[in-house]
Design a protein with these regions (language model features):
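ABC family nucleotide-binding domain
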Residues: 1-138, 142-146
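Conserved beta-strand-loop-alpha-helix hinge in the C-terminal portion
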Residues: 109, 149-159
């Protein structure tokens, strides 16, 4: 078993998290928010800035690096949250209703399109939790939680 510190380091290094609400720190800029996992992982500040800037460019926010969350739209805030989840190049990203805080139209769809594109280009697994069947159908694999069991195509999935 891992100690609490080892578990925290493992999560920070290997798992990215995207929540329904972005959970950005309001007093920090977009690039500073994305730098956080790197700084916590004891990366050099200059290197962290460079890596965070690059990943923000990958999510279409290279012109918004120095904006604080309150100066960003909801869709931009959520893209910063996705960039933060990706900044350490994790093995997997867990996304809990990532578009749930956005309108179902253009912004929500654009975020989901970006997640699917990033999954393919970075060859990275995203585990997306959603109540929206339409979103689930876009996934490579869909499982349901029924009575406490994960079920896929009428077969129980081993986790």
């Amino acid at each position: 078993a891992l100690t609490d510190d080892q578990g925290a380091e493992f999560r920070n290094r290997s798992i990215g998290f995207v929540f329904q609400f972005h959970h950005l720190l309001p007093e920090f800029t977009a690039v500073e928010n994305v730098m956080m996992p790197l700084l916590i992982g004891r990366h050099d500040r200059e290197e962290a800035y460079e890596v965070a800037s690059k990943i923000l460019g990958e999510v279409g926010l290279s012109d918004r690096l120095d904006h604080k969350p309150g100066e960003l739209s909801g869709g931009e805030q959520q893209r910063v949250a996705v960039a933060r989840a990706l900044v350490r190049r994790p093995l997997v990203v867990l996304a809990d209703e990532p578009s749930g805080n956005l309108d179902r139209g253009k912004n929500g769809q654009a975020l989901l399109d970006m997640i699917w594109d990033l999954s393919r280009t970075l060859r990275l697994a995203f585990v997306v939790v959603t109540h929206d069947e339409e979103i689930g159908r876009r996934a490579d694999r869909m499982v349901r939680l029924i009575d406490g069991h994960l079920v896929e195509l009428n077969q129980e999935v081993t986790v």
